[in-house]
Amino acid sequence: MQKGIEVDWLLNYRGGSFLIYYNQNIENELKIRGVSYQVVADAKVNLILTEIANPEVNMDIIKLEKTPKIAVYSPKSKLPWDDAVTMVLTYAEIPYDVIYDEEVIGGKLPEYDWLHLHHEDFTGQYGRFWANYRGASWYQDDVRNQENMAKKLGFNKVSQMKLGVAQNIKNFCSGGGFLFAMCSGTDSYDIALAAAGIDICERMFDGDGITPNAQSKLDFSQTFAFQNF
């Protein structure tokens, strides 16, 4: 695509394949990089397209018209686990920028076409680690960094900052941006949106208790995918 060559993405065909016109330079590149490929005749292409067009199969074709500008929502500090998304993108030599709360709150999201996120707790409770790792230096550093950033950006609590991030991401998607979320980035995201305006964080996370009857005050009309949690 960067070289102006048309590419079709064959969704769910052989695990998700790409269809391009034959090009010797591309074939050489595939060989060098160890990418599996198959050269097919026009008749075979027509059979593939016919198979994908069958309404009884869960397949589709998307024409890729531009190289998307990709952002990965990931903390700048080092945590005990690897960021799988950035590892894959780096290995595949796909350009991307790493952004986090400051960039999102600062209005940077509209500069991108695609946003990836995964290991994140948008509720402001620092993931599932408090019970076992609250004494670990990496956990304490993360809490300190998050609290300092919240204050820098004008928020009283980390949970309020994370809600602001979640709402900015929601607006990004409403404006046509693509979001790929996985791991805790999926469910904690909707929990934060549903809990807007109420406090669901216990004292050990933000210094005060939760809003009375917080469960009954969740607004599931604000979520993307989940409800009744």
Role assignments for model-derived ranges:
Residues 1-173, 201, 205-208, 220-228:
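Intrinsic-disorder/low-complexity accessory segments
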Residues 182-229:
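An acidic, glycine-rich "communication" segment
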Residues 161, 180-181:
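Short, contiguous, pocket-lining structural segments
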Residues 175-177:
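A short helix->loop->beta-strand "cap" motif at the edges of active sites that frequently abuts
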